[in-house]
Amino acid sequence: MAKLALIEREKKRAKLVAKYADKRANLKAIIDDQEKSEEERYLARLELQKLPRNANPTRQRNRCAITGRPRGTFRKFGLARNKIREIAFKGEIPGLTKASW
Protein backbone atom coordinates (compact mmCIF):
# COMPACT_ATOMS: atom_id res chain seq x y z
CA MET A 1 0.00 0.00 0.00
CA ALA A 2 1.27 3.46 -0.89
CA LYS A 3 1.97 5.97 1.84
CA LEU A 4 -1.04 8.03 2.77
CA ALA A 5 0.86 11.26 2.06
CA LEU A 6 1.36 10.25 -1.59
CA ILE A 7 -2.32 9.46 -2.02
CA GLU A 8 -3.31 12.77 -0.43
CA ARG A 9 -0.84 14.63 -2.64
CA GLU A 10 -2.53 13.17 -5.72
CA LYS A 11 -5.94 14.22 -4.42
CA LYS A 12 -4.61 17.74 -3.88
CA ARG A 13 -3.27 17.80 -7.45
CA ALA A 14 -6.64 16.65 -8.79
CA LYS A 15 -8.36 19.52 -6.97
CA LEU A 16 -5.87 22.05 -8.35
CA VAL A 17 -6.28 20.75 -11.89
CA ALA A 18 -10.06 21.06 -11.61
CA LYS A 19 -9.83 24.54 -10.06
CA TYR A 20 -7.59 26.02 -12.76
CA ALA A 21 -8.87 24.04 -15.78
CA ASP A 22 -10.99 26.87 -17.24
CA LYS A 23 -8.38 29.58 -16.70
CA ARG A 24 -5.69 27.33 -18.16
CA ALA A 25 -7.82 26.53 -21.23
CA ASN A 26 -8.53 30.22 -21.84
CA LEU A 27 -4.84 31.14 -21.61
CA LYS A 28 -3.87 28.27 -23.93
CA ALA A 29 -6.49 29.44 -26.45
CA ILE A 30 -5.03 32.97 -26.40
CA ILE A 31 -1.50 31.64 -26.83
CA ASP A 32 -2.51 29.46 -29.80
CA ASP A 33 -4.60 32.18 -31.48
CA GLN A 34 -2.57 33.65 -34.35
CA GLU A 35 -5.05 36.55 -34.65
CA LYS A 36 -3.94 37.98 -31.30
CA SER A 37 -0.99 40.35 -31.11
CA GLU A 38 2.41 39.14 -29.98
CA GLU A 39 2.13 41.18 -26.79
CA GLU A 40 -1.23 39.64 -25.84
CA ARG A 41 0.12 36.16 -26.45
CA TYR A 42 3.26 36.96 -24.47
CA LEU A 43 1.21 38.23 -21.51
CA ALA A 44 -0.96 35.11 -21.65
CA ARG A 45 2.19 32.98 -21.58
CA LEU A 46 3.39 34.84 -18.48
CA GLU A 47 0.02 34.32 -16.78
CA LEU A 48 0.16 30.62 -17.61
CA GLN A 49 3.59 30.39 -16.02
CA LYS A 50 2.25 32.01 -12.84
CA LEU A 51 -0.29 29.22 -12.31
CA PRO A 52 0.67 26.59 -9.74
CA ARG A 53 2.85 23.82 -11.12
CA ASN A 54 0.48 21.14 -9.85
CA ALA A 55 -2.40 22.70 -11.79
CA ASN A 56 -0.96 21.05 -14.89
CA PRO A 57 -2.85 17.80 -15.64
CA THR A 58 0.31 16.06 -16.83
CA ARG A 59 1.62 16.02 -13.26
CA GLN A 60 -1.21 13.77 -12.15
CA ARG A 61 -0.55 10.08 -11.68
CA ASN A 62 -3.22 7.39 -11.97
CA ARG A 63 -3.36 5.45 -8.73
CA CYS A 64 -5.34 2.47 -7.52
CA ALA A 65 -8.41 3.59 -5.57
CA ILE A 66 -7.88 0.86 -2.97
CA THR A 67 -4.12 0.54 -2.48
CA GLY A 68 -2.73 3.73 -4.03
CA ARG A 69 -0.42 1.70 -6.26
CA PRO A 70 0.89 3.97 -9.07
CA ARG A 71 1.81 1.29 -11.62
CA GLY A 72 -0.33 -1.30 -13.32
CA THR A 73 -3.50 0.74 -12.90
CA PHE A 74 -6.38 0.21 -15.33
CA ARG A 75 -8.14 3.45 -16.22
CA LYS A 76 -11.46 1.73 -16.85
CA PHE A 77 -11.69 0.47 -13.27
CA GLY A 78 -9.35 2.82 -11.41
CA LEU A 79 -7.77 -0.20 -9.77
CA ALA A 80 -4.39 -1.89 -9.86
CA ARG A 81 -4.07 -5.16 -11.78
CA ASN A 82 -3.75 -7.30 -8.66
CA LYS A 83 -6.84 -5.79 -7.04
CA ILE A 84 -8.82 -6.24 -10.27
CA ARG A 85 -7.83 -9.90 -10.21
CA GLU A 86 -8.90 -10.37 -6.59
CA ILE A 87 -12.21 -8.59 -7.02
CA ALA A 88 -12.96 -10.26 -10.37
CA PHE A 89 -12.42 -13.75 -8.91
CA LYS A 90 -14.91 -12.90 -6.16
CA GLY A 91 -17.37 -11.89 -8.90
CA GLU A 92 -17.78 -8.33 -7.67
CA ILE A 93 -17.14 -6.67 -11.05
CA PRO A 94 -20.26 -7.17 -13.17
CA GLY A 95 -19.66 -8.52 -16.66
CA LEU A 96 -16.01 -9.37 -16.05
CA THR A 97 -15.10 -13.01 -16.50
CA LYS A 98 -11.85 -14.89 -16.72
CA ALA A 99 -10.79 -15.49 -20.31
CA SER A 100 -10.82 -19.05 -21.57
CA TRP A 101 -10.38 -20.32 -25.11
Swiss-Prot record:
Part of the 30S ribosomal subunit. Contacts proteins S3 and S10. Belongs to the universal ribosomal protein uS14 family. It comes from the Bacteria. InterPro entries: Ribosomal_uS14, Ribosomal_uS14_bac/plastid. Keywords: Ribonucleoprotein, Ribosomal protein, RNA-binding, rRNA-binding. It comes from Cupriavidus metallidurans (strain ATCC 43123 / DSM 2839 / NBRC 102507 / CH34) (Ralstonia metallidurans). The gene is rpsN. One of its GO terms (cellular component) is small ribosomal subunit. SUPFAM superfamilies: Glucocorticoid receptor-like (DNA-binding domain). GO terms for molecular function: rRNA binding; structural constituent of ribosome. Binds 16S rRNA, required for the assembly of 30S particles and may also be responsible for determining the conformation of the 16S rRNA at the A site. This is Small ribosomal subunit protein uS14. The keyword Ribosomal protein applies. HAMAP family: Ribosomal_uS14_1. One of its GO terms (biological process) is translation.
